[in-house]
Every structure is written in structure tokens, then in C-alpha cells.
Amino acid sequence: CALLDHTVVALISGGGMAVVTSQVLDVLTPNARRGNLHVMPTSGSRYYRWDGTQWALVYAHDLSEATVAAVSESLERHARELGLWEQQVWGPRIENRGSQITFSALGQFAPVSAKQAWDSDNTKKQALVEAVKADLPHMRARAGGYTSVDVSECGIDKAYAVRKLTQTLGIRADEMVFVGDRMTPTGNDYPAVEAGAIGVRVENPQDTVQLLDALLARFDTPAR
């Protein structure tokens, strides 16, 4: 909330709008400057702005039913073949987020500790990414969170979101700072850097909090 008092913020998440709403939007204070927040869930393939009363949809690139079925089938088949179809899960393994299909090996609601331990070197996720890409070369598959793989249309990713923001805000991409934990070339945050944004890599939520605290301290320090 405090950051919105000082600057424009874009929330570009691999999660769907329901997750973004429950984890972020629903906990904003009544006086938060929502007009300074650009909400871009499912890796930027959807875009919402506050219209004074609610979060209004600006655009959505939803997948066709045939594409959803093909992606879901490929994810499940290869996850089983690779031994990634875990028996203990917390929530659905495969989610249709409208404009993106996400595979979560332990389920969307798995404990963070379990997620962090599942694929610490990213080899499991990357193996699934490569298998799905071989099936569906016209789609983009990338490692998402600790246990997830995101599949969307080629060209509709966080780079697309950055380009949309440059148009909306009238600024250059290199005037944006993009903070993310998947900044390797195979990660779903990397396209934002490819689009020209300044990338800042964090490892976990605690890193992000420390970064925000330091940034807010700079805003609150009087100019000399």
C-alpha cells in the first residue's frame, strides 16, 4: 500500500486473478491508491485497472477450448512419464486460468516449504517444459513458481505486459524496474528483461520485503 503513495506499480503474476485477488487485492487498505496499480495476472495475458468501484478487465487473451484440451493432455501425460505426477497434492495439479494453463506439481495451495524443497535446481520443471514444447511448438512453456510450469500463446507473456505498460504509461521499458524470482533465460520472469525492463532478481518473499523497505526509505528521505 505504501509504495502506491509514491509511484505506479504493476503486478505481473503467473497466478490467476482469483489468486491475485485473495493474496493482494483483498488485503489493500480502504485508502490505498488503487488507481496507481496495474494488475496483470496469468503472466500479463490479462490486464485489470481500478475504475473507482471495481477491478475492470482491459484485455484478455483467453485460450480456445481445443488449445486448453491439448495443453492439459500434454502436461498430464508428460508429468506422469517423468514421474512428476505426485500423489500428495494440495489443490488441482492443472489449472485453466483462461489465458494460461498452469501445472502445479504439488497443487496450487501446497505449503511454501514443500514447494521450495520439490525442485530446488529446476531440473524437474525444465524437463516438463521441454517435453511440452516438443508437443506444442506453437505455444510457449516456461518454468513458473517453485513447482509450476506455465503454458500460454507465443508472444503473450511478461514481455507483452511490459510493452503494453510502455504504451499505457508513455514511458520506455528501461524506465521500469521488474522484480522477480525466475530471472534465468528459461524462467517466466525473463521475458520482461528481454523487453527492456531493468531486472532485479529476488530469491524469496523476504528478499522482496527487504527491497521494498529499502525503496520506501529512499522515498521518505528528504532530498538534499
Language-model regions, residue ranges each:
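Conserved acidic, metal-coordinating active-site core of Asp-based
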Residues: E81-L82, E86-V177
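Active-site phosphate-binding/coordination module
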Residues: C1-W90
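Mg2+-dependent phosphoryl-transfer enzymes with acidic/Ser/Thr/Gly-rich catalytic loops
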Residues: S152-C154, K158-R224
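Short, solvent-exposed loop/turn segments at secondary-structure junctions
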Residues: M17-A18, R46, Q108-A110, T147-S148, ...
